[in-house]
């Protein structure tokens, strides 16, 4: 046996006798390399038995080198294998212990799949998701849901009423059925104004002899009117815009004014009238703009020039908050009341002077009440505290759950009419929530970011529910919510598609308009390459407005409509039947609105980069600079220069260019790098909120879209005043406006630049 083993071992190395040679590492003085040859003991025994003298044989160099090469190869293979194996074990050691080296390759592979916690579903692409969304929407009957929400079960549903709460609970249950990640409610205690159950609001003509001629005890009312009694001359002021008041040939000082509904909000009409020293306002729907058959139709609205609970300005209306009594500066100090067209025509019968042709108004319109007559207005509205509920459901993102898009709709309404005002938006909200729930649970859609669906109430009192939620999370919401999509009043007609949005969303909306087809003519919604110039500014009565102007969150609102206003909003005729009569293709129109909103949601939550085009504000800043350049002489006369404003605008342009370059150079698969870039993009809108005014005193701090002396439009208006009436111009105010606007723009540029060491400090 020993002979066989020795023979096999010997043959492995070419049949040569084995010897090991040790070479000295030190070079010998005489140039020789000494070595020691060692023979195996078995060889020595064999030589001794055969009585043969061992002779030293020189090993063959070729076979020796082959031996060392083989050994080296084996060693390197083992080192590489062990390094890789130990590295793998280290990665998964938290899950389970390393597998033994002796296990098969198949076992290693199967255990690798078990221990790696990586989603196995394939990622759907934009084209796949568009098709999937379209197919889902095709199977839904939106009109049935709108009809259900417009029935007596849920109407009338004034904010805080029993039927409003019943609808809130229904929506909450629906969200639970959709298997959302979380469903919750937000509770507030707010003060709203309602008609008195004791006294009536009244409009009366006071004859010269003191006799009273009753005109109307209106069914409708205007919330947040000053409850008081006034009497005076009555004059017409068209729509009640600032321009309308400026163009009047008679004074409104100490007079009641009557204005048409439309063009601007009730609150703006009242504020304008108050600024021209009017003592009260009457609002009606004229026949030309609102061709409604019923002349005695009542109208509802509110007069708060702001949003949220006006008795807790700047802070949320949570129960038992210990704030001192206060009220919003946007509340009017004069009474305001809506009247029917029949009542307005009765008043016109006592008035004189034809209305200007440029007003494009019906012939019954008159300008001033006859001499020796007055109109008496009595408003007896009362404040009520109501508990209101906002309902939320969230689909959490799979990569960045702490970043979310909010999709919301108002569910309440003043009066019995609810269809176009709140049922369409609420129905669309529910169906979109259902569609996205199905896409995730059944079709493999994995949004990177979260989607929050929100049902607001008290929207008819000035986006109270939405604003109170924003006020409750003012310090943190802008760091997490990056877009608000408003679904209110999305279908009022078929002819036009109108958009109101933050400039950050213009580019994305343009792409979606090119994708989505109009259901009537089959053409793209993108009809005009110059559509951005026709984008309308968000109004006070739009729930998207406080998101943009108060919280600095990009927001978008859109609708299908006609050239003329929808005639039934704010009236009891806003019914499902009236809506389907005006919009026979209601189901197709709402489905198209759902496709627009759905594509927005997908693009904002699916793509690696946030689809917010921060470069669009470059054109807005450039437009502002052009407006300001018209007053270069005035500015120079005050010893001022626009140099620093130019510099701030230039820094913003350079910051956007650098950010675009950073994005193009970034490794898109590196989530940490992309998150850092997206965080910089998210800061843009928020940093356009002026940091130099109080959110309590001036809640709408956005220098482009806000309201107050800190806005860029107010700065320009101040310069116009200097040219018109220099004695009324406040130079100190203007200097502050210019300085603070400059530093606000510079702050946005700095935020876009990223880390503090990347900011150009040579301002």
Swiss-Prot record:
Single GO molecular function: protein-containing complex binding
Parts of the chain on the Cytoplasmic side: 1-67
Outline the segment boundaries, as ranges, of region: Mediates interaction with SH3BP4.
1-67
Q: Which residues carry this modification: Phosphothreonine?
A: 21
In residue numbers, the region (Ligand-binding) covers 572-763
Q: InterPro entries recorded for this chain?
A: PA_dom_sf (IPR046450), PA_domain (IPR003137), Peptidase_M28 (IPR007484), Peptidase_M28B (IPR039373), TFR-like_dimer_dom (IPR007365), TFR-like_dimer_dom_sf (IPR036757), TfR1/2_PA (IPR037324)
The record, for SUPFAM superfamilies, names: PA domain, Transferrin receptor-like dimerisation domain, Zn-dependent exopeptidases
Keywords of this entry: Cell membrane, Disulfide bond, Endocytosis, Glycoprotein, Lipoprotein, Membrane, Palmitate, Phosphoprotein, Receptor, Signal-anchor, Transmembrane, Transmembrane helix
PA domain sequence ranges: 225-315
**Cellular localisation:** Cell membrane; Melanosome
**Where does this chain carry the motif Cell attachment site?**
649-651
| Annotated Pfam families | PA (PF02225), Peptidase_M28 (PF04389), TFR_dimer (PF04253)
Sites of Phosphoserine modification: 10, 19, 24
Q: How is it modified after translation?
A: Stearoylated by ZDHHC6 which inhibits TFRC-mediated activation of the JNK pathway and promotes mitochondrial fragmentation. Stearoylation does not affect iron uptake. N- and O-glycosylated, phosphorylated and palmitoylated.
Topological region Extracellular: 89-763
Residues bearing the modification Phosphotyrosine: 20
Q: What is its main location?
A: membrane
Residues with a covalently attached lipid (S-palmitoyl cysteine): 67
Biological role stated in the UniProt entry:
Cellular uptake of iron occurs via receptor-mediated endocytosis of ligand-occupied transferrin receptor into specialized endosomes. Endosomal acidification leads to iron release. The apotransferrin-receptor complex is then recycled to the cell surface with a return to neutral pH and the concomitant loss of affinity of apotransferrin for its receptor. Transferrin receptor is necessary for development of erythrocytes and the nervous system. Upon stimulation, positively regulates T and B cell proliferation through iron uptake.
Q: How does it assemble?
A: Homodimer; disulfide-linked. Binds one transferrin molecule per subunit. Interacts with SH3BP4. Interacts with STEAP3; facilitates TFRC endocytosis in erythroid precursor cells.
Q: Which family does it belong to?
A: Belongs to the peptidase M28 family. M28B subfamily.
- Annotated PANTHER family: N-ACETYLATED-ALPHA-LINKED ACIDIC DIPEPTIDASE, TRANSFERRIN RECEPTOR PROTEIN 1
State what protein this is by name: Transferrin receptor protein 1
Gene symbol here is: Tfrc
